Amino acid sequence: APTYNQIEKMSKVTGIPLGYFFLEKPSVEDSSFVEYRTVDSKELSNPSRNLMDTLHDMELIQEWIRNELQATESDDLSFVGAIKKTVQNNDFATFVRRSLQIEINWYESCKNGEESFKLLRNYISDLGVVVMMSGIVGNNTHRILDTNEFRAFALVDKKAPLIFINSNDSFNGKLFSLLHEFA
């Protein structure tokens, strides 16, 4: 049987919380509450520890922001959940443009995907959506987020919606994910 120090070392190496090693049965984490984008929009049935820890970190940030907004009696954001999945693509695009107050050809003034992404990120942030971006879990540079597992995810909330973008993606990928998650 491994010693406590060996288990502690294994916990650090794998990124698995130490207490998990002492459970009778492995815990099952529910990730069904969140939708996230993968490459080729594949469904992911067993999210990695890196994804689950990132989700948890973003939930904590969202909860803190929501509590601050509730304390200041901020209104709910009217556009969150305002459009149904059954709407036609053209109607949907119009809704997004109106929400962001941008023209059909907004991207023509941008030099490249990076500039387009930054502009759109600012528009979305100005509406009250928290847009977070990282390529690692927390501050751990050894725990790199895999774009094959997920490119982005959204945590829907009427007061504090949050979009997380995997910064290891290309700028065009980030741009698409940002628009997709805003929707």
Residue ranges and their predicted role:
Residues 1-183:
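Short juxta-domain linker segments that transition from a proline/glycine-rich
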